[in-house]
Each structure stands twice: as structure tokens, then as C-alpha cells.
Amino acid sequence: MKAKYLLYLLITPAVLLFSSCTDFFEQDSDHVQYTDDYKLTEPGDTIYALTGIMNKLQALGDRTILLGELRGDLVSVTSNASADLRGIANFDITDDNAFNSPKDYYAVINNCNLYIARCDTAVKNNRREYLFKKEYAAVKAYRAWTYLQLALNYGKVPFVTTPITTEEQANAQYETKDLQGICQYFINDLSPLVDVERPGLGVIGSVDSRLLYFPISWLLGDLNLWAGNYKQAALDYYHFIATANGANTYFPVGAQYVAFYSANWNSFEIASMFNNESYSDSRKVVTMIAGDSIPSQGNYSQLRNYFNTSEANNYKVSITPSEGLIALSRSQKYCYMDASLGAKASPIIAPSDLPENKSGDLRLMFTWSTGNGYVNGKHYSRQSINKYNSRNIHIYTRTMVYLRLAEALNRAGYPRFAFQILARGVNNDVLKEYVLPYCHTAADSAFVGQFSFPSTANTGYIVRDITSNRSYNTMGIHSIGSGWTEYNPYYQFPTDSLVSDTLSYQIEKVEDLIMNENALECCFQGTRFYDLMRVALRRNDPSYLAKRVYARQGSANVATEKATIRKDLTNPNNWYLSFKGKIGL
């Protein structure tokens, strides 16, 4: 039997724990049976099966963004939002909510389990290279990422790593794992595969397939970050950066920004700000889930219609930036430097009362635009979120990995290293001047020494320098929207001579800066709720998440938002979804 038939198979429908076989898997009378000894041994078989798994991932695209963003503090739902979207935002996600469907996750997982069980990884080509190792590793990464999403959203989930193909297997009872159990299992599962290259399937439709995989080193970083293995997480993220374009290559933050052209505050220059989907050594998008091109195909992403006015949504959006995000953006201090003056330039802080979101960080102004529109002689309020102008769903982006590297380094005990990622950008010269002098033990110096960001006059990680006209590709992430952060007197490494535990104080304050930067840089991208959750869990302080979500409509409207949500978010059990009492806490 050819593996292409597996595309019709959500492999014999089954539930995993304590319930009938219809709870997590749909019955499908057209499924194809296969023999227990069937193996994937032909290239065509493995390609069909791999693209079949990609197809199943499409069902998870929109909800990955929505569950991660609507429950955070950076967006609000409008009166035009559906009951399902409103339910997510209000933490009132019922069993019949369209985005509460564990079976879609298990459809991916069971297809992955089948592939892993049946793929013959011993087959070699005439060059004695293992023929299917790349596909095998990619499928293991798909499975790990999907289980991580399940655990983040449901808390405790049925855990199965073998394909369910019979009624007897369907009716068996299986163990459950929580987030920590999921992380530990897949850290062990993926670590041996960290240096396996991604498959080379070329272009699928109009999409470069190299953007459709989850890099194992990055995924290991996420798993270790959630597990609290901060040094290893930092090394994993660095491993991704150092090998993103092949061994011993470079993957810098890039020279991307939106900035005031002058201190007149009325014109801008914009460089490389769009997350286009082309594949290059300087690509912005690292991983995405491909969406269908037309609605009738079944996995057509609606995100563009949720965030942008269009004919398809009758010019009415469902999601808009929250007052909390607007206030955070406005509260930043934009630092202008006249680069034409070189070393003679001095910092000028932009006024705090500029109109049209021009005060503070400029990324929100660039990303979110509103205005008046007219169609057929009728007025409507126009909104555009330019992060959603594609049918594909962006999961990992380049700046995101640097922010997670900063988060891991900070919690590993290296807040100065983390701070430089935000403020200046890092290369070996920056590490030598601003990080290594504060490593007071040989062990700390040795750890930092494992990170190398080399540069020459025109290659490697070239940090911008106001005294030089040379091209650069590395800058502090805060500078993407807030000007010359490295010269900003309001953006300094936190110190307090009155604090006895200086390192703990610095780590918490730098973590606050990182979380603010996550909001400014990654807003609308589906990561915010999980960022808040991660910090709240590691600080053992559920109120860290709760007070921010309750304040998303502004500090003056906290009581109103609490009444709308009607869930005590200081109780972590209320952060998670459940489904028919069969999954969840």
C-alpha cells in the first residue's frame, strides 16, 4: 500500500483515555487498512506521508495564534467577534467552541506516530547515506511541537507515542503527562537528532518547504526553557543561530527598524520591517504553517479577516490592539541620534505627546493603521495589521529566537548578556566589553565563552556604530522601534545599591524588559499568553499573569475586565482548556 493513502487516514479513529473512540478522533468509513508489517521504504511513500502530516498541521494554524494572543493582554475582541473568539478572550471556552478540538492535535500526533513506527531509517542510498533520516527527524519535531501545544493549552494530556490502529488499542487506557513530563520526554527524544538537516522537498505549491519545518535546536530551546533548564535552553537557541544557514554561518538580528528621519518627528525611514516569506540567509520567517489558498479547501486561514477590514468580513474586524498594548508602546522613550554628526551626536528624546501613535516605540504605529474607508458610498472604519497579509501562519521569526535566547540567558544568571541583546546587539567585541568583565568565576567565563558571534569589517555580526559608515546587520532589538537604544539614558541596565541580592534583582528587572520587548516586537503573533504564563510559573506568582490580563483594557478598567472574564486568573487551573472532562486539569 502506498503511503499516499495515509492522507485519507486519521489513522483508525480512537480515543486515548477513559472515553469512547469518538472523543478525540473522528470516525472515517473511508479509511484504508494496512498490514502491521508495512514499512515506508520508498522515497515517494515518505514524501506523501510527510506532506500528509503538514496537511493535518494546517488545522492547528489559526488556533495557535488565537489561543496564544486572545488570552493575553495585547489585544481586545470587538463587538463583531464571534462567540468562539469572545469565549477565548474571556476564558470561557466551552466544549463546542470551534477552537477547542483536541482531536485535531491527535490527528497530527497519530499520523506522526505511524510515520515514526513505519519509517525504515536503516535504508541507505548508493552513497551509504541514510535515506529517510531527515524526514524522520522532521516528523519527530512535528510531534514534539504538537504535544507542547497540547500541554500549554490543556495542562495535562493523554500521552501516546505508538500508532493506534485497532479498536483494542483505542479502548486501552494510556498515561497522561503534564507540561514538565512532555518537555522531559521530548528533550530526550529530540536531542540525538539536533544536527540532522531538514528535508529538501523544494517548493510545495508556492511555498518554499524549508519554511515548513520546526528546527530541532530551536524546539529543544523551547522545551528546556519551559522545563527550567536555562543554560541548556540558551545553548540550544545559540545552536540554532549558529547553524541556521549551515555549519559555522551567521544569522544576525538584521538591520531592520522603523525610525524618525529627523528630530522634526514628522517623517520616517523604514528598513526591512516586513516578514516576507522568501527563503534567504537573512530570512525573517523561520517556520510557518501553510494555509490553503481558497476558503473551500477547508484549512483556509481566517486570521487576515479577524485582524483586517475587508469585503470578506463586511469591513468589520474582530481583533484590535488593546489599551494595554497602546499604553506600553506609548510609554517607551524614543531616542534619536543625528548619525551625520558621528561621535558628536547626542541623544534627543522624542516628545511624549505626538499624535497617531508616534510617541514611544514606533513598531505599533508601523504595524497597525486605521482610518476612514468608503465602499459603495458607505463609510467604514478601516483597520490593517500588516503582520497578517498572507494566507500562511508564521510561528517562528528571527527576532523571536533572539528574545528567547535573552530570556534563557537572563534566567541562567547572565542578565548583562541578555540586556545587550535588547540594547546594543551582540558580537564578540560586545561580549568582551560588556559581559565577560562581570563573569566573576571561571565557570561563568567558560559558559559565556561557548557563545561566539564573530565579526570582521564586512562579515559576521557587525554591530552598528554611529562613528562608522559601514553597513551593519546587528542591533539591539529594542532599537527596532525605539531609536538608538545604546545611547538612551532611559534604557539602562538595572542597578540598585540598596538591594542585597543584586543578581536576583537584576534578573527580575531584565526579565521585565524582555517581556515588554516580547510585547512590542511579537504582538499579534500568538505568543503573548504563553510568555506571561512562563514567567508567572517560574516566579510562582500567578498574579503576574492575572494583573496584566485584567488590565488589557487600561488600568482604569480593571474591575470591568474582571467582571467580563469572570474567572479568577490567580488560580492557574483557570488558564487551561478542558474538553468533555477527558482532557485538561
Model regions and ranges:
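Membrane-proximal, proline-rich intrinsically disordered regions
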Residues: 21-70, 544, 552-585
